[in-house]
Amino acid sequence: MDKMLEISEEAITRYFTTLSQFGYKKYSDVDKIIVLFFMEEMLAGEMSYYVTQDDYRNIVNALYCLAGSTCMIDFPMFESYDTLVHSNNRTFVPRITEDSILRSTEDDNFRVEA
């Protein structure tokens, strides 16, 4: 929820910056910021206990509609620390299990069935 709060803070900062420079902002943009604050309050406040999985999915879809529709609400940043190349462990020798013909003890003595 901290990321949602950061997006809300950035939106209100941009709103007041625009308001101080131009003196006016369209009501539709202000309504979108109010909806953003309502969603943040609903997810972080006392109403979060009543939000179901379907409600959460609808809120996420609404946030994607809000993000980028106005210059006030920025798209969220997704950071991926994953790489395209993954190391594999091919240097490991596969263990001979008890299904195998050759079995050994903990002292590396072979067990032979008579």
From Swiss-Prot:
Transmembrane segments: none annotated. It is found in: Virion. Keywords: Viral tail protein, Virion. Heterotrimer with THA. The heterotrimers further assemble as 12 docking hubs that anchor the trimeric tail fibers. It comes from Bacteroides phage crAss001 (Bacteroides phage PhiCrAss001). The keyword Nucleotide-binding does not apply. It comes from the Viruses. Forms the tail hub together with tail hub protein A (THA). This is Tail hub protein B. GO terms for cellular component: virus tail. Its main location: virion. The keyword Membrane does not apply.
